[in-house]
């Protein structure tokens, strides 16, 4: 979706994100090493984690204010070293509603990218605030269109339905 906001004649978006990865597992699986090979001088590198870092499995878990910050610093520092321009981003808001109120599900992870960006003097985008505002504007029912949510039989590729939010 992000890449659809740019004129393809002027901006190339090379999305290397992978579902389910944390700041730790993306490095441990060698995915970051592959991305580094692609970074050229002047490239903007958008770095967004936190969505899966709170998972309890040791392959993905990081600690905000500690290991999570260390990984974000590694991404940003290595991007700078390669001549790229790192942009740290907070995680997008999850669709988690309780009694008609959107509930934060990222805790301290949502704040750490800002802290790290400031400490390194690099760019920062508060994707959590932007997406949280959009979720709230659309409301609990309307925000479904932002997510992978289909009832059984509604979409051929998901015959049994699918719901990717946290309720």
Question: Model features per residue range: what roles?
Answer:
Residues 22-30:
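Structural motif
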């Amino acid at each position: 979706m992000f890449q659809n906001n740019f004129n393809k004649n002027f901006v190339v978006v090379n999305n290397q994100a992978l579902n389910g990865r944390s700041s730790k597992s993306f490095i441990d699986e060698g995915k970051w090493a592959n991305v580094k090979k692609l970074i050229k001088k002047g490239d903007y590198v958008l770095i967004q984690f936190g969505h899966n870092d709170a998972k309890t499995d040791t392959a993905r878990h990081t600690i905000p204010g500690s290991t999570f910050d260390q990984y974000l610093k590694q991404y940003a520092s290595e991007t700078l070293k390669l001549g790229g321009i790192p942009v740290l981003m907070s995680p997008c808001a999850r669709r988690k509603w309780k009694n008609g109120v959107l509930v934060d599900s990222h805790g301290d992870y949502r704040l750490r990218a800002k802290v790290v960006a400031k400490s390194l003097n690099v760019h920062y985008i508060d994707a959590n605030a932007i997406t949280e505002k959009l979720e709230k504007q659309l409301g609990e029912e309307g925000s479904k269109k932002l997510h992978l949510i289909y009832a059984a039989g509604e979409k051929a590729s998901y015959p049994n339905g699918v719901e990717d939010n946290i309720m």
